[in-house]
């Protein structure tokens, strides 16, 4: 009887210990979960605060920079999208306040997107009824509107660039000194730098030979286009060509190589990053700039089905452009859009 009582007491004691242990574990787990949740909320709030600060700083800000003891940078951004042409202009205006220089200084970075507007079309009235319209050229044009007191002193990129990726850095030092180098990174100490970086695989960037102190133009033009196992020049009428019995007038896309193999600038579009450095006489309070983004399209015309008829190539046959006029207030360091216009014109040299 005594042994049975001892076993019962021991069993009750073990159950009590197990229950106490489980309760302690659950309490610790709940406390840890609470700590983790508090930590997560703290991190999330910190990240949100940091994100808000970065966003606000990027949009409109005045921040000190290494351009001298009392130098500072005021940043403005203007964005304009045109639905009809599917072109977006995003311009960054960096006003450099340099007390050691007797002129206003401005860096304008031209960004945004020019969508490819790649299209397959059917034109039953023609023998070569299956058409492919693709972006053979992209153009960015920047000019000072009728104001001799504001001048363009430098630009990026310069000359002709054929590499798949373009990277360059512009550097400004106190006293109005400036420099530019290939690659990303500061070019010297005690300077303010701005970089450009964009992809142009199978295309070339060409800075127009007619550039002057009030006008600069960049052309990004298709060269040798690679798709799948093929490599063909833009001037080759057999570019993207496909001769197959399954192609019909109702399915023009089947007369050409699969679009998923096309280079990114053909398939999706182009994201420009071009830079202009300007100076302005302090007696001049306002200046207007006209910025034009243009997409030129070549048309390839194929006859559906198995045949021996040659394809037809028509260069720069169509185009779309977005023209925006911006006004800079030098005294208040502000920018506003004063005019916007778009049409279906391609860029023509001359």
UniProtKB/Swiss-Prot annotation:
Key words of the record: Signal
Native organism taxonomy: Bacteria, Bacillati, Bacillota, Bacilli, Bacillales
Region entry Disordered, spans: 28-71
Alphabetized InterPro entries for the sequence: Bi-component_toxin_staph, Leukocidin/Hemolysin_toxin, Leukocidin/porin_MspA_sf
The UniProt record lists the keyword Signal: yes
Compositional bias per record (Basic and acidic residues), positions renumbered to this chain: 30-60
The family this protein is said to belong to: Belongs to the aerolysin family.
Full protein name: Uncharacterized leukocidin-like protein 2
A Pfam family this chain is assigned to: Leukocidin
Signal sequence range: 1-27
SUPFAM superfamilies recorded: Leukocidin-like
CC annotations in GO: extracellular region
One Gene Ontology term from the biological process aspect of the record: cytolysis in another organism
Key word Lyase present: no
């Amino acid at each position: 009887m005594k042994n049975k009582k001892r076993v019962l007491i021991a069993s009750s004691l073990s159950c009590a210990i197990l229950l106490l242990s489980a309760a302690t574990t659950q309490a610790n787990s709940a406390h840890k979960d609470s700590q983790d949740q508090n930590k997560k909320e703290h991190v999330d709030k910190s990240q949100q605060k940091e994100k808000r600060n970065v966003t606000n700083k990027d949009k409109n800000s005045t921040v000190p920079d290494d351009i001298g003891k009392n130098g500072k940078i005021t940043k403005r951004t203007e964005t304009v999208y045109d639905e009809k042409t599917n072109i977006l202009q995003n311009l960054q205006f960096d006003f450099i306040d340099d007390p050691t220089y007797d002129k206003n200084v401005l860096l304008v970075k031209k960004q945004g997107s020019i969508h490819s507007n790649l299209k397959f079309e059917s034109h039953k009235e023609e023998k070569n009824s299956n058409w492919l319209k693709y972006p053979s050229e992209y153009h960015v044009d920047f000019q000072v509107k009728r104001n001799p007191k504001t001048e363009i002193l430098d630009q990026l990129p310069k000359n002709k660039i054929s590499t798949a990726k373009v990277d360059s850095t512009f550097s400004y030092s106190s006293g109005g000194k400036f420099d530019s180098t290939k690659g990303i990174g500061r070019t010297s100490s005690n300077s303010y730098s701005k970089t450009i970086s964009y992809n142009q695989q199978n295309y070339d960037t060409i800075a127009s030979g007619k550039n002057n102190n009030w006008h600069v133009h960049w052309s990004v033009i298709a060269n040798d286009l690679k798709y799948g196992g093929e490599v063909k020049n833009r001037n080759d009428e057999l570019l993207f060509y496909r001769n197959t019995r399954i192609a019909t007038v109702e399915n023009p896309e089947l007369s050409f190589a699969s679009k998923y193999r096309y280079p990114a600038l053909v398939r999706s579009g182009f994201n420009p990053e071009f830079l202009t450095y300007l100076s302005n006489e302090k007696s001049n309070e306002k200046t207007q700039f006209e910025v034009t983004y243009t997409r030129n399209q070549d048309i390839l015309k194929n006859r559906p089905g198995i045949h021996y008829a040659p394809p037809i190539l028509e260069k720069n046959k169509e185009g779309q452009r977005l023209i925006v006029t911006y006004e800079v207030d030098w005294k208040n360091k502000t920018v506003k859009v004063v005019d916007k216009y778009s049409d279906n014109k391609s860029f023509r040299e001359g």
